[in-house]
């Protein structure tokens, strides 16, 4: 018997570790585009899940952005069924007319579809193929836009996606390993031309910025950026937990927040409290920026009688009688 290729073994170990920790015995789903990362993930999951007594299926999303996308999605589905994954779902999404550009629109539509499929099938978890390289790119993009700790924490290894856990088991695996695993398994991954299109910021980081950093600072750059994300994520989780407790402590029975209570909080916690409250009010996380949180902060620590702070979705927040109070869009003040 031929020895198992090290990249294949590494990916299977990562999948096993992720699945063993799942408390819900329900099925798992792999999100697979047919690219090397998600294809290696799907192949490993098809091998590991049954050996843990767990069923595993696959969902592939056709964004309809390229000629032949429907045929490619069908080919991924056929391969998945032949590999033993079940159920297998193909979902077509429409990304036209969505705000934020094609990259953001495709991502939003994809995750909405994945959430619906996972919920409909009662999946315990949805697995995606994001790698250590993806994490490094995410950190660089966050740095470029001036993100705070939450952005620098990168992609979490797990988070809730509707009723299912979203798992990223390959964040400690390199893109080189997923490609090598596909080669070792005789798989022919699809190469997404968008990944090399300089119109997209992530593609430019992948093709130009990260290679330049590796040349200038050495090959450990990718690992170090990913490690930075892990370290920041630990601190961010602790601060978020403090903020959750603090939010309850400053909340007024009418739904507003006590200005005095907010002012007593340390800035790192206060900013998180205001961010969490804005989300409770209905501000979309993707649209909620540091500028919006800063406007809320100014109502607490920079009060000079100014008017309302404006949040995404037409929401407004006023300072009244020692409280921050939300005003419905369109309401007369």
From Swiss-Prot:
Q: Name one GO cellular component term.
A: cytoplasm
What catalytic reaction does the record list?
A: cytidine(34) in tRNA(Ile2) + L-lysine + ATP = lysidine(34) in tRNA(Ile2) + AMP + diphosphate + H(+)
Alphabetized Gene3D superfamilies for the sequence: 1.20.59.20, HUPs
Biological processes, Gene Ontology terms: tRNA modification
* Protein family (similarity comment): Belongs to the tRNA(Ile)-lysidine synthase family.
| Coiled-coil regions listed | none
Please identify the protein, giving its name as recorded: tRNA(Ile)-lysidine synthase
Tell me what gene encodes this. tilS
User: By its UniProt entry, which SUPFAM superfamilies does this protein fall under?
Assistant: Adenine nucleotide alpha hydrolases-like, MesJ substrate recognition domain-like
Q: What is the lineage of its organism?
A: Bacteria, Bacillati, Actinomycetota, Actinomycetes, Micromonosporales
């Amino acid at each position: 018997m031929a020895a198992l290729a090290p990249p294949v073994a590494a990916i299977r170990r990562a999948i096993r570790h992720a699945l063993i920790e799942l408390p819900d015995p329900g099925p798992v789903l792999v999100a697979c585009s047919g690219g090397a990362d998600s294809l290696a993930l799907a192949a490993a999951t098809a091998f590991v899940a049954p050996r843990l007594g767990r069923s595993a299926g696959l969902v592939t999303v056709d964004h309809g952005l390229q000629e032949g996308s429907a045929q490619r999605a069908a080919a991924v589905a056929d391969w998945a069924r032949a590999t033993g994954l079940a159920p297998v779902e193909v979902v077509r999404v429409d990304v036209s007319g969505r705000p934020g550009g094609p990259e953001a629109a495709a991502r939003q539509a994809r995750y909405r579809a994945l959430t619906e499929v996972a919920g409909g099938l009662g999946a315990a978890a949805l697995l995606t193929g994001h790698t250590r390289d993806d994490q490094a790119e995410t950190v660089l993009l966050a740095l470029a836009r001036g993100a705070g700790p939450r952005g620098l924490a990168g992609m979490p290894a797990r988070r809730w996606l509707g009723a299912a856990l979203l798992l990223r088991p390959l964040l400690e695996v390199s893109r080189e390993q997923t490609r090598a695993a596909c080669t070792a398994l005789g798989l022919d991954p699809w190469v997404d031309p968008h990944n090399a299109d300089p119109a997209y910021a992530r593609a430019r980081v992948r093709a130009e910025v990260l290679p330049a950093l590796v040349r200038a600072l050495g090959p450990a750059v990718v690992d170090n950026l990913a490690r930075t994300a892990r370290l920041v994520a630990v601190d961010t989780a602790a601060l978020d937990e403090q903020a959750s407790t603090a939010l309850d402590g400053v909340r007024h029975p009418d739904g507003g927040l006590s200005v005095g209570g907010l002012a007593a909080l340390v800035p790192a916690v206060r900013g998180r409290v205001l961010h969490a409250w804005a989300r409770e009010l209905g501000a979309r996380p993707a649209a909620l920026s540091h500028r919006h949180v800063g406007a809320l902060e100014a109502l607490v620590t920079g009060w000079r009688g100014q008017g309302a702070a404006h949040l995404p979705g037409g929401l407004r927040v006023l300072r009244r009688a020692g409280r921050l109070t939300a005003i419905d869009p369109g309401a007369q003040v």
